Swiss-Prot record:
One of its GO terms (cellular component) is membrane. It catalyses: all-trans-lycopene = gamma-carotene; gamma-carotene = all-trans-beta-carotene; 2 (2E,6E,10E)-geranylgeranyl diphosphate = 15-cis-phytoene + 2 diphosphate. The chain crosses the membrane at residues 6-26, 30-50, 76-96, 118-138, 146-166, 168-188, 230-250. This is Bifunctional lycopene cyclase/phytoene synthase. Pathway: Carotenoid biosynthesis; beta-carotene biosynthesis; Carotenoid biosynthesis; phytoene biosynthesis; all-trans-phytoene from geranylgeranyl diphosphate: step 1/1. PROSITE patterns: SQUALEN_PHYTOEN_SYN_1, SQUALEN_PHYTOEN_SYN_2. One of its GO terms (molecular function) is lycopene beta cyclase activity. It comes from Sordaria macrospora (strain ATCC MYA-333 / DSM 997 / K(L3346) / K-hell). InterPro entries: Isoprenoid_synthase_dom_sf (IPR008949), Lycopene_cyclase_dom (IPR017825), Squ/phyt_synthse (IPR002060), Squalene/phytoene_synthase_CS (IPR019845), Trans_IPPS_bact-type (IPR044843), Trans_IPPS_HH (IPR033904).
């Protein structure tokens, strides 16, 4: 009795609830709109087709297997299947695609490799052939009727989608398109096999080939679930392609609302690919790789941000890391001062007093010329793509001052011990340094979040958030220093305040010679961590005021980094994993648990 309803209660609804619970922390309004639009399209496209199948006796349902209500002869349980299948497959697609930055896969839209052009044309020809064959096969009362009706209905839609987004789909990593098709398909095959075995629904004899994939699962039913899931996944990819165009190219779409409008999606489809700034895509690719190599915690957290905010945060990190590397890789203090002077002049080019009548294009060309003249080629993209039109100048200048403080340390390999200089003399110097190299980054991140998520935020709320972000940045830097005492000592640096060392009867040389030895160093590490967690507890409640789209990912990034401090405090075997260079980190599973806990708490 009511077997079809129980199929949903036992198999489709529980899976949908489970996937919703898993995906909930990363879902945003764009995902909801995207999935809702696809459900509407799938429902309206399948409705007349399904009604025709029932009218022609291809599908039938025993009266006792359904609740009763119908629309165009279609049981409500079947109508619900249109919705729930689309929802399930869309969620699987979203989960697999969340780490992917789709903008990186737009470069093949203009200059695709030969294999991609061949694959797209081949796919089009195959879909045309299947559509024609399906039309001929879909004659009433013959063994190919059902299979033909599936192909003549689905293949034209697939052909249209493949024509629109074939290159983009081929550009994506295979697992983000193939697995969202395969996994729901296998699950629904198993559900269908059980339903057919119980007689919940049946396929009319004489309209099918009488071949089964396994058990009672007819080849036609297997084909149906496969092609419908292909439609859903490729439909989601079309949305993502046009969203990627909107987010990736600010010259084409200077102002993007929190949620792009349908008109913007149409406009992104109509943009000629010759207008794509492929140099920007390449620069973004470099920035992502720099983030991946240099910060595993923030690389993981960044994938949870969305839209242009995610891109601008990556570009900000790339600039900060590049500037830091220029200082750290310098061979002399003079070279460090040269780099900091050039970085300051670069900022002056953007923020300094300039001729108000200067054409913006000429200004951009002037700045580009300076970058190419003053910096090595590998630095060009990180400097060129920095979103200075959004970022406030003061934190950027303060960041450079932080690098200048680094330049006061003895350089690795120097044999002149008489010139040792350690700029962190007192607590206030430690705080100043942390503000400059980390508090500023927190302020810059908040500036990007406010610009993209809530530009009309009140000034008082902005100031509170900026202050909290600065304090949290200081806390993270204290954790960083506590973690890297050994690593810093290996390059001649001691960030522990001189006053702390004197209290414990230590010298800088003692720390450099044996950074992990004396118990008093561990005592100072704990003191540093205590300061970090005190600042963390002060700033953490204020972070709840971050706009909802960015709150979870931002807090997740913070919690992931503070977890390093927690495991340093615990000192449990297996909890702190020390890499070869002496830097402690958190096991991957624990990082993931920390991130998920932070997201679900939001």
């Amino acid at each position: 009795m009511y077997d079809y309803a129980f199929v949903h209660l036992k198999f489709t609804i529980p899976l949908a609830v489970l996937l919703t619970a898993i995906a909930y922390p990363v879902l945003n309004r764009i995902h909801v709109i995207q999935t809702g639009c696809l459900i509407f399209i799938a429902f309206t496209a399948a409705l007349p087709w399904d009604a025709y199948l029932i009218e022609q006796k291809v599908w039938s349902y025993p009266p006792e297997a359904i609740v009763g209500p119908r629309l165009l002869g279609i049981p409500f349980e079947e109508l619900f299947f249109f919705v729930i299948q689309t929802y399930i497959t869309a969620l699987v697609y979203i989960l697999f695609n969340k780490p992917v930055l789709h903008a990186l896969h737009l470069n093949n839209q203009r200059n695709p490799p030969a294999w991609m052009r061949i694959a797209k044309v081949t796919g089009q020809l195959i879909l045309v052939a299947l559509s024609v064959w399906g039309w001929k096969a879909a004659q009433v009362n013959q063994k190919t009727t059902y299979l033909g009706l599936i192909l003549v209905w689905a293949c034209p839609f697939l052909l249209a989608i493949w024509t629109l987004a074939g290159r983009f789909i081929l550009s994506l990593p295979w697992f983000v398109t193939v697995l969202p098709v395969v996994l729901p398909t296998f699950y629904l095959w198993a559900v269908d096999e059980l339903a057919l075995h119980r007689g919940t629904w049946s396929i009319g004899s004489g309209t099918k080939l009488e071949y089964c994939l396994f058990g009672k699962l007819d080849i036609e039913e297997a084909t149906f679930f496969l092609v419908t899931n292909m439609l859903i996944v490729s439909g989601m990819a079309v949305f993502d392609q046009y969203l990627a165009v909107i987010y990736a190219f600010p010259t084409l779409f200077p102002k993007v609302n929190r949620y792009p409008t349908p008109l913007m999606l149409v406009q992104s489809r109509l943009v000629n690919t010759t207008k794509y700034d492929l140099e920007r895509i390449e620069g973004l690719r470099e920035a992502v790789e720099r983030l991946r190599l240099k910060s595993r915690s923030f690389y993981l957290a960044n994938s949870l941000f969305s839209g242009r905010l995610r891109i601008d945060l990556i570009l900000l990190y790339s600039f900060c890391r590049l500037a830091d590397d220029l200082v750290d890789d310098a061979k002399s203090r003079l070279e460090v001062l040269s780099w900091t002077a050039k970085l300051n002049h670069f900022l002056d080019q953007h923020y300094g007093d300039s001729d108000a009548t200067e054409d913006p294009k000429q200004k951009a060309e002037r700045i580009d010329a300076y970058i190419k003249e003053a910096f090595p080629p590998f630095a060009y993209q990180a400097l060129h793509l920095l979103p200075t039109h959004i970022l406030p100048p003061k934190p950027l200048y303060e960041l450079i001052k932080g690098f200048e403080m680094d330049s006061q340390f003895t350089f690795h390999g120097s044999s002149d011990s008489t010139n040792l200089k350690f700029p962190i003399a007192h607590d206030k110097d430690l705080k100043t340094y942390a503000i400059r190299v980390a508090g500023t980054v927190g302020e810059l991140c908040i500036a990007l979040i406010i610009h993209h998520c809530l530009p009309d935020m009140s000034d008082s709320q902005k100031r509170r958030l900026e202050s909290a972000a600065c304090r949290m940045g200081i806390a993270l830097q204290y954790v960083n220093i506590a973690r890297d005492i050994l690593v810093d000592a290996q390059i001649g640096r001691v960030y522990l305040p001189t006053s702390w060392l004197k209290e414990e009867g230590l010298t800088h040389k003692a720390v450099l010679d044996n950074p992990e030895g004396p118990e008093v160093i561990e005592k100072m590490r704990r003191r540093l961590l205590d300061n970090a967690f005190e600042l963390y507890r002060e700033a953490r409640p204020e972070m709840q005021q971050i706009p909802s789209e960015a709150r979870g990912p931002m807090i997740g990034a913070v919690e992931n980094y503070m977890e390093i401090g927690r495991v340093l405090r615990e000192k449990k075997v297996g909890q702190v994993f020390v890499r070869k260079e002496g830097r402690a980190t958190v096991p991957k599973q624990r990082r993931l648990r920390t991130l998920l806990r932070a997201l679900y708490e939001q």
